[in-house]
């Protein structure tokens, strides 16, 4: 199930702007498609958002 930007706040408090929420969803969905691992996808998205914040 693909994530949306609305899902970002449930997984990281650092996605505080609409742009960061969109970035989180993009990274998480790309990682999920590539690896098929939801946990890894969330961790990767959280890491990218943390670096951008």
Regions found by a protein language model. Name each.
Residues 1-53:
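C-terminal alpha-helical interaction appendages
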